Amino acid sequence: NKNKNKNLYPFFFFFGVGVAFKLVQALQTRLKGLPEGQEKWLLDLVALGTVCDSVSLIDENRANVYWGLEVMKKQHRPGLKALLGVSGTKSDKIDSRTLGFVLGPRLNAAGRLKTADEALDLILSNNNKDAVKRADYLDKLNASRRVEQDEITAKAKKIAEDYQDNSVLVLSDKNWNHGIIGIVASKIMEQYKKPTFIISENEDNAVGSARSFGDFSVADAIHYAHDYIIRGGGHKVAAGVTLDVNKI
Protein backbone atom coordinates (compact mmCIF):
# COMPACT_ATOMS: atom_id res chain seq x y z
CA ASN A 1 0.00 0.00 0.00
CA LYS A 2 1.74 3.16 -1.20
CA ASN A 3 -0.01 5.22 1.49
CA LYS A 4 1.65 3.32 4.34
CA ASN A 5 4.75 5.06 5.72
CA LYS A 6 6.70 1.82 6.11
CA ASN A 7 6.03 0.57 2.60
CA LEU A 8 9.41 -0.22 1.03
CA TYR A 9 8.14 -1.60 -2.27
CA PRO A 10 9.83 0.35 -5.11
CA PHE A 11 6.70 0.87 -7.27
CA PHE A 12 4.08 3.29 -5.95
CA PHE A 13 1.49 3.48 -8.73
CA PHE A 14 -0.67 0.44 -8.05
CA PHE A 15 -4.37 0.80 -7.37
CA GLY A 16 -6.91 -1.82 -6.31
CA VAL A 17 -6.36 -4.52 -8.89
CA GLY A 18 -2.56 -4.16 -8.78
CA VAL A 19 -2.46 -4.52 -5.00
CA ALA A 20 -4.77 -7.55 -5.21
CA PHE A 21 -2.43 -9.18 -7.74
CA LYS A 22 0.61 -8.57 -5.51
CA LEU A 23 -1.30 -10.34 -2.72
CA VAL A 24 -1.92 -13.31 -5.02
CA GLN A 25 1.78 -13.40 -5.93
CA ALA A 26 2.73 -13.35 -2.24
CA LEU A 27 0.30 -16.17 -1.44
CA GLN A 28 1.69 -18.14 -4.39
CA THR A 29 5.13 -18.19 -2.73
CA ARG A 30 3.85 -19.10 0.74
CA LEU A 31 1.04 -21.61 0.28
CA LYS A 32 1.98 -25.22 -0.29
CA GLY A 33 0.66 -27.23 -3.21
CA LEU A 34 0.14 -24.36 -5.67
CA PRO A 35 1.86 -24.82 -9.06
CA GLU A 36 4.51 -22.14 -9.55
CA GLY A 37 3.72 -19.30 -11.93
CA GLN A 38 0.02 -20.05 -12.37
CA GLU A 39 -0.96 -16.57 -11.18
CA LYS A 40 -0.02 -15.35 -14.67
CA TRP A 41 -3.43 -16.57 -15.88
CA LEU A 42 -5.04 -13.80 -13.83
CA LEU A 43 -3.19 -11.10 -15.75
CA ASP A 44 -6.03 -10.63 -18.25
CA LEU A 45 -8.20 -9.40 -15.37
CA VAL A 46 -5.32 -7.35 -13.94
CA ALA A 47 -4.87 -5.65 -17.31
CA LEU A 48 -8.60 -4.97 -17.58
CA GLY A 49 -8.76 -3.42 -14.12
CA THR A 50 -5.59 -1.39 -14.61
CA VAL A 51 -6.73 0.24 -17.85
CA CYS A 52 -10.30 0.84 -16.69
CA ASP A 53 -9.09 2.51 -13.48
CA SER A 54 -7.09 5.08 -15.51
CA VAL A 55 -3.86 4.06 -13.78
CA SER A 56 -0.51 5.33 -15.11
CA LEU A 57 0.76 2.72 -17.58
CA ILE A 58 4.38 2.71 -16.41
CA ASP A 59 6.74 0.09 -15.00
CA GLU A 60 4.83 -2.85 -13.47
CA ASN A 61 1.45 -1.52 -14.58
CA ARG A 62 2.66 -1.45 -18.17
CA ALA A 63 4.11 -4.95 -17.90
CA ASN A 64 0.90 -6.28 -16.36
CA VAL A 65 -1.18 -4.81 -19.18
CA TYR A 66 1.20 -6.12 -21.87
CA TRP A 67 1.20 -9.67 -20.58
CA GLY A 68 -2.46 -9.47 -19.64
CA LEU A 69 -3.31 -8.77 -23.27
CA GLU A 70 -1.25 -11.80 -24.29
CA VAL A 71 -3.22 -13.95 -21.84
CA MET A 72 -6.52 -12.51 -23.09
CA LYS A 73 -5.66 -13.37 -26.68
CA LYS A 74 -5.61 -17.04 -25.66
CA GLN A 75 -9.30 -16.62 -24.74
CA HIS A 76 -9.33 -19.01 -21.80
CA ARG A 77 -12.34 -17.26 -20.21
CA PRO A 78 -15.64 -18.02 -21.99
CA GLY A 79 -17.17 -14.83 -20.55
CA LEU A 80 -14.60 -12.42 -21.96
CA LYS A 81 -14.52 -14.37 -25.22
CA ALA A 82 -18.31 -13.99 -25.53
CA LEU A 83 -18.14 -10.29 -24.68
CA LEU A 84 -15.57 -9.75 -27.41
CA GLY A 85 -17.86 -11.66 -29.74
CA VAL A 86 -20.96 -9.54 -29.15
CA SER A 87 -18.87 -6.40 -29.65
CA GLY A 88 -17.49 -7.68 -32.96
CA THR A 89 -13.87 -7.62 -31.78
CA LYS A 90 -11.46 -10.26 -33.08
CA SER A 91 -8.96 -11.81 -30.67
CA ASP A 92 -5.95 -10.76 -32.75
CA LYS A 93 -7.10 -7.12 -32.61
CA ILE A 94 -7.16 -6.84 -28.81
CA ASP A 95 -5.24 -3.88 -27.34
CA SER A 96 -5.56 -1.45 -24.44
CA ARG A 97 -8.37 0.39 -26.24
CA THR A 98 -10.30 -2.89 -26.30
CA LEU A 99 -10.03 -3.04 -22.53
CA GLY A 100 -11.01 0.58 -21.94
CA PHE A 101 -13.65 1.11 -24.62
CA VAL A 102 -15.08 -2.33 -25.47
CA LEU A 103 -14.91 -4.68 -22.49
CA GLY A 104 -14.81 -2.13 -19.67
CA PRO A 105 -18.00 -0.24 -20.57
CA ARG A 106 -20.00 -3.43 -21.06
CA LEU A 107 -18.86 -4.92 -17.75
CA ASN A 108 -19.39 -1.63 -15.94
CA ALA A 109 -22.88 -1.25 -17.38
CA ALA A 110 -24.03 -3.98 -14.99
CA GLY A 111 -23.04 -2.00 -11.90
CA ARG A 112 -24.16 1.31 -13.36
CA LEU A 113 -27.71 0.21 -14.18
CA LYS A 114 -28.32 -3.04 -12.27
CA THR A 115 -25.86 -4.94 -10.09
CA ALA A 116 -22.15 -5.70 -10.53
CA ASP A 117 -22.95 -9.38 -9.86
CA GLU A 118 -24.10 -9.63 -13.48
CA ALA A 119 -20.58 -8.79 -14.67
CA LEU A 120 -18.96 -11.10 -12.12
CA ASP A 121 -21.18 -14.00 -13.19
CA LEU A 122 -20.08 -13.47 -16.79
CA ILE A 123 -16.37 -13.46 -15.89
CA LEU A 124 -16.76 -16.61 -13.77
CA SER A 125 -18.86 -18.48 -16.34
CA ASN A 126 -17.31 -21.73 -17.59
CA ASN A 127 -20.10 -22.52 -20.05
CA ASN A 128 -19.92 -21.07 -23.56
CA LYS A 129 -23.70 -21.01 -24.08
CA ASP A 130 -24.29 -19.35 -20.71
CA ALA A 131 -21.47 -16.88 -21.38
CA VAL A 132 -22.96 -15.80 -24.71
CA LYS A 133 -26.36 -15.25 -23.08
CA ARG A 134 -24.83 -13.14 -20.31
CA ALA A 135 -22.64 -11.20 -22.74
CA ASP A 136 -25.63 -10.35 -24.90
CA TYR A 137 -27.48 -9.09 -21.82
CA LEU A 138 -24.55 -6.83 -20.83
CA ASP A 139 -24.29 -5.54 -24.39
CA LYS A 140 -27.95 -4.48 -24.28
CA LEU A 141 -27.46 -2.91 -20.84
CA ASN A 142 -24.55 -0.92 -22.22
CA ALA A 143 -26.73 0.38 -25.05
CA SER A 144 -29.29 1.56 -22.48
CA ARG A 145 -26.48 3.17 -20.48
CA ARG A 146 -25.42 5.16 -23.54
CA VAL A 147 -28.91 6.58 -24.02
CA GLU A 148 -29.20 7.69 -20.39
CA GLN A 149 -25.63 8.99 -20.44
CA ASP A 150 -26.33 11.15 -23.50
CA GLU A 151 -29.38 12.65 -21.80
CA ILE A 152 -27.46 13.55 -18.64
CA THR A 153 -24.49 14.87 -20.63
CA ALA A 154 -26.73 17.16 -22.68
CA LYS A 155 -28.30 18.58 -19.52
CA ALA A 156 -24.92 19.01 -17.83
CA LYS A 157 -23.54 20.88 -20.85
CA LYS A 158 -26.51 23.23 -20.76
CA ILE A 159 -25.83 23.98 -17.07
CA ALA A 160 -22.09 24.39 -17.74
CA GLU A 161 -22.74 27.22 -20.18
CA ASP A 162 -23.58 29.46 -17.21
CA TYR A 163 -20.29 28.67 -15.43
CA GLN A 164 -17.70 28.77 -18.21
CA ASP A 165 -15.59 31.36 -16.37
CA ASN A 166 -15.18 29.14 -13.30
CA SER A 167 -11.79 27.48 -12.77
CA VAL A 168 -13.54 24.30 -11.66
CA LEU A 169 -16.94 23.14 -12.89
CA VAL A 170 -19.35 21.90 -10.22
CA LEU A 171 -22.61 20.86 -11.88
CA SER A 172 -25.56 19.28 -10.10
CA ASP A 173 -29.14 18.24 -10.68
CA LYS A 174 -31.71 15.99 -9.09
CA ASN A 175 -31.61 12.21 -9.45
CA TRP A 176 -28.87 11.83 -12.04
CA ASN A 177 -27.85 8.16 -12.15
CA HIS A 178 -24.94 7.62 -9.74
CA GLY A 179 -23.49 4.95 -11.98
CA ILE A 180 -23.25 7.26 -14.98
CA ILE A 181 -22.13 10.62 -13.59
CA GLY A 182 -18.46 9.56 -13.70
CA ILE A 183 -18.60 9.15 -17.47
CA VAL A 184 -20.43 12.46 -17.79
CA ALA A 185 -17.75 14.16 -15.68
CA SER A 186 -15.09 12.87 -18.08
CA LYS A 187 -16.95 14.19 -21.11
CA ILE A 188 -17.55 17.63 -19.59
CA MET A 189 -13.90 17.82 -18.48
CA GLU A 190 -12.71 16.94 -21.98
CA GLN A 191 -14.92 19.59 -23.59
CA TYR A 192 -14.22 22.47 -21.21
CA LYS A 193 -10.63 21.51 -20.26
CA LYS A 194 -11.36 22.07 -16.56
CA PRO A 195 -11.59 19.89 -13.45
CA THR A 196 -15.21 18.78 -13.24
CA PHE A 197 -17.54 17.59 -10.49
CA ILE A 198 -20.88 16.10 -11.57
CA ILE A 199 -23.24 15.77 -8.61
CA SER A 200 -26.55 13.96 -8.26
CA GLU A 201 -28.90 15.50 -5.69
CA ASN A 202 -31.09 13.20 -3.60
CA GLU A 203 -33.47 14.07 -0.76
CA ASP A 204 -30.75 14.66 1.85
CA ASN A 205 -27.33 13.80 0.49
CA ALA A 206 -25.69 14.47 -2.84
CA VAL A 207 -23.31 12.04 -4.53
CA GLY A 208 -20.70 13.31 -6.93
CA SER A 209 -18.01 12.08 -9.29
CA ALA A 210 -14.96 14.17 -10.19
CA ARG A 211 -12.46 14.17 -13.04
CA SER A 212 -9.26 16.18 -13.09
CA PHE A 213 -7.59 18.32 -15.74
CA GLY A 214 -3.95 19.38 -15.87
CA ASP A 215 -2.08 19.40 -12.55
CA PHE A 216 -5.25 19.77 -10.47
CA SER A 217 -5.80 16.85 -8.08
CA VAL A 218 -9.46 16.13 -7.39
CA ALA A 219 -8.47 13.86 -4.49
CA ASP A 220 -6.58 16.73 -2.84
CA ALA A 221 -9.49 19.09 -3.47
CA ILE A 222 -11.85 16.69 -1.69
CA HIS A 223 -9.37 16.31 1.17
CA TYR A 224 -9.10 20.08 1.67
CA ALA A 225 -12.90 20.41 1.60
CA HIS A 226 -13.39 17.95 4.48
CA ASP A 227 -15.43 20.52 6.44
CA TYR A 228 -18.08 20.48 3.73
CA ILE A 229 -18.31 16.80 2.84
CA ILE A 230 -19.55 13.62 4.49
CA ARG A 231 -17.03 11.35 2.84
CA GLY A 232 -14.94 11.17 -0.29
CA GLY A 233 -11.77 9.83 -1.84
CA GLY A 234 -9.98 8.71 -4.96
CA HIS A 235 -6.78 9.71 -6.68
CA LYS A 236 -5.46 12.67 -8.65
CA VAL A 237 -7.36 11.94 -11.85
CA ALA A 238 -10.70 10.64 -10.54
CA ALA A 239 -12.57 10.69 -7.25
CA GLY A 240 -15.97 10.43 -5.63
CA VAL A 241 -17.65 12.50 -2.94
CA THR A 242 -20.78 12.54 -0.77
CA LEU A 243 -22.03 15.75 0.83
CA ASP A 244 -25.12 17.46 2.16
CA VAL A 245 -27.26 18.92 -0.62
CA ASN A 246 -27.11 22.31 1.08
CA LYS A 247 -23.29 22.28 0.96
CA ILE A 248 -22.97 21.99 -2.82
Predicted regions mapped to residue ranges:
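Generic recognition of well-ordered alpha-helical segments
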Residues: V19-A26, Y224
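Short amphipathic alpha-helical face segments that pack within enzyme cores
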Residues: F15-K22, I183, K187
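Hydrophobic helix-and-loop "lid/oligomerization" segment in the mid-to-C-terminal part
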Residues: Q28-K247
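Hydrophobic, small-residue-rich alpha-helical packing segments that form membrane-like cores
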Residues: N1-V19, T29-K32, G37-K40
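Low-complexity, compositionally biased segments
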Residues: K4-P10, F21, A47, S56, ...
